[in-house]
Amino acid sequence: MILVFGGTTEGKKVAGILEEAGYQFCYSTKTETDFQPGNYRFGAFTKESLADFCEEKNVQVIINASHPFAEGLHQTIYEAVDVPVLRFERSYPERLAHPLIHYLPSYPAAIEYLNTHPVSNLLALTGVQTIEKLKSYWSDHKTIFRILPRSVAIAEVSGFPAENLILEMPTDDLQHELSIIHQYNIDGIITKESGDSGFLFIKIAAAIHAGIPIIIITRPELPKTFFPVYDEEELLSQLNKILE
């Protein structure tokens, strides 16, 4: 059995590759999604429950195609299992040296930077799970969060003002991103290094086009034991080696 951690564009791609190749697999996401290939489960794993699941299902290899910022999951996989882990990586735009682009390693570092380089209206594109992480900033400074429509309840629990929410999916439409910047008088953006799948290149282009700074939280390092693969050929080659 192959266990796939998805919930991403990459996860869907992996599921399609495995189905076409005839591999038996279980597709797992943290929350229930509309994309549910044959053998599907959802819900967060603890170290203990993941270890039990892998033993019960005779999992021989894990394909981690989850979000690059799913740090809790990455650590759980690392600590819970001793089967091979393939990391199906997304592509990332090259980091750019530009006066408007600021790569920072953490949210505390971003808050510190914003406190010393204040903006009037910050557009946060870091996702609903980061509302709490940025609370010390938005409690005192105007911040607009764009989040998925299904995530409103999480924002409400955090006490974030509903009038400062934009409820929509990220887009690859530069003009749409610029229209948001102009509509809300945005003069600063914070986002994550989420790669091409997260349309990072569009967010950077929008900031540069509008002449406003963009803070990019750099993606966390993955455990060294995760073996990276970048396309279908590499994935199938590694699976053949592991499962032969």
Where would I find each of the regions flagged by the language model?
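Short, polar loop motifs at secondary-structure junctions
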Residues: 27-34, 88-94, 128-130, 147-153, ...
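N-terminal basic/disordered segments at the start of proteins
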Residues: 2-31
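Hydrophobic, well-structured mid-protein blocks that either form specific transmembrane helices
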Residues: 85-143
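A C-terminal functional module that forms or caps the active site or interfaces directly
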Residues: 156-180, 184, 188, 193-210, ...
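Anionic-ligand binding region
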Residues: 125-166, 174
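N-terminal beta-loop-helix "entrance" segment that forms/cooperates
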Residues: 16, 26-47, 154-159
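Glycine/small-residue-rich loop that forms an oxyanion/phosphate-binding "nest" at active or ligand-binding sites
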Residues: 51-54, 61-109
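Glycine-rich, highly charged phosphate/nucleotide-binding loops
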Residues: 38-57, 166-176
